From Swiss-Prot:
Enzyme Commission (EC) number: 5.4.99.27
Catalyzed reactions: uridine(13) in tRNA = pseudouridine(13) in tRNA
Taxonomic lineage: Bacteria, Pseudomonadati, Pseudomonadota, Gammaproteobacteria, Enterobacterales
Gene giving rise to this polypeptide: truD
Protein name: tRNA pseudouridine synthase D
Family to which this protein belongs: Belongs to the pseudouridine synthase TruD family.
Gene Ontology CC, one term: cytosol
Keywords: Isomerase, tRNA processing
Length: 349
């Protein structure tokens, strides 16, 4: 998907700069949202890694602990071209924990290990704390103004280009699969292609809402989400004024669909709007229904938490913030500056 075609909330930036001049410029620390139990048949291992992707480390841990690879899990993928602190889970029923003091893998450091009663599954993560360094910024004044706007109004909650694969290949393959031009047997590829399809449709609807000044305007039949929650409800016509006040106050978020094999979830005016946005996506919608993917919804806008900016000099900015799981730091950066080098294809947040 071409991110250049998506609408900006604060207008296209005038400043340009570089993200990820080196891995240390992109630091991610997982926030599980809970404290490990301290007992149980699972061992949670927190590792700081640089230059290693998540699955590679998981497979290495399995070999080190003499476990089947399926017995090592994690909450989410992280970029190999960054410094990341991530939790891995080893299933050790009735077994002693391996001696992690002898664990050696270039670019990796074991920070702690603690027992836990439950398996760490994909998505069982509250969020991620990011510390980024943006370099060679051309317009400090514009960036500072945008940081104020982002703190007050947020950014579009777009899925980043990395969700669609290098050069958007996951979406290309999804369309070929949808048209029965290729067969996709590998489970991981099926998952990537379906995820890219749903993410692209979410981005499309969100972009249309922004373009029509509807990102914070409640339509009759909109699906609204309590801030910080996953559940949502439908806006009734006789409640629009009160609901609009709550959206304006930041208590509620307007959502867009990640389409599945069921209805979109909206009604009336909002449903008609979403259907119009997806009118040319029939092949992807058919694929999603054929594969019986469960639908969900996601907030159109995202407000970074605990955002702190620190200028090292007039052209170098250190920026830290927290995002809920599934949201992309690159979508925040997109509202701040244009990237001179679009080196984000491997960032998985």
């Amino acid at each position: 998907m071409d991110m250049e075609n998506l609408t900006w909330l604060h207008g296209k930036p005038t400043a340009s700069g570089i993200l990820k001049a080196n891995p240390e410029d992109f630091v991610v620390v997982e926030d599980l949202g809970f404290e490990p139990d301290g007992e149980g048949e699972h061992l949670l291992v927190r590792i700081r890694k640089n230059g290693c992707n998540t699955q590679f480390v998981a497979d290495y841990l399995a070999r080190f602990a003499k476990l089947h690879p399926r017995l090592v899990s994690y909450a989410g993928l992280k970029d190999r071209h960054a410094v990341t602190e991530q939790w891995f889970c080893l299933h050790l029923p009735g077994k002693e924990a391996p001696d992690l003091a002898t664990f050696e893998l270039e670019g990796c450091e074991v920070l702690e290990a603690v027992r836990h009663k439950r398996k760490l599954r994909i998505g069982s993560l509250k969020g991620n704390a990011f510390t980024l360094v943006l370099r060679h910024i051309t317009d400090r004044q514009d960036v500072e103004q945008r940081l104020q706007q982002i703190a007050a109004q947020g950014v579009p909650n777009y899925f980043g280009s990395q969700r669609f694969g290098r050069g958007g290949n996951n979406l290309v393959q999804a369309r070929l699969w949808a048209n029965n031009e290729i067969r996709v047997k590998e489970r991981s590829k099926r998952s990537f292609y379906l995820s890219a399809s749903r993410s692209a449709m979410f981005n499309l609807i969100s972009s249309y809402r922004l373009a029509q000044q509807l990102s914070t305007t409640v339509l009759e039949g909109d699906a609204l989400q309590l801030s910080g929650r996953g559940s949502w409800f439908v806006a009734q016509a006789d409640e629009l004024a009160a609901l609009q006040q709550r959206v304006t106050a930041g208590e509620l978020n307007i959502t867009a669909p990640l389409p599945g094999d069921s209805e979109l979830g909206t009604h009336g005016e909002a449903l008609a709007f979403e259907q119009a946005c997806l009118a040319e996506q029939t092949e992807l919608l058919s694929l999603i229904k054929r594969e019986r993917v469960e639908g969900s919804r996601r907030a159109v806008l995202l407000k970074p938490q605990n955002m702190i900016s620190n200028w090292w000099d007039d052209v170098t900015l250190e920026l830290s913030f927290w995002l809920p799981a599934g949201s992309f730091a690159t979508s925040v950066v997109r509202e701040i500056m244009n990237q001179d080098r679009a080196d984000d294809t491997d960032i998985i947040e």
